[in-house]
């Protein structure tokens, strides 16, 4: 598994990038906006929703959800304190920003109606553990919206790095769709 040291390195790396991340995250925006277009509130919803942005980074999409009606509680969880500090600066008030590991979420059972997770799960050592945690915190009938990268994504970049620096890995390995 990914060691705590590796997770700390990932969190620190994203923290360092937090100030410029939103300007450089075109793929994340494209994927997240595609997911948002599919997001619908149920007409029969009998209560306002509790929504979690898992792997929220600087809170770009968390802020978009803040503009929706019918959301009683909005939270963003990220491994990187630096990303969450940027999210707090970006506002608005009223969003709970939580430092947490997606494989061990610091949230109670059956406490969330909707989990939105955009291009985060590929950074996790055990995607199955993340999905089990999502199932644990989702209320019955809750919705999980996840986007990720699969094996074969970024193959051109991987090929270019292989030619430039043979024998060294510069592009993350991604799960196959069967593994998920």
PLM region spans:
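A short glycine-rich, Lys/Arg-flanked "PGG" loop and its adjoining helix->strand segment in the class I
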Residues: 128-143
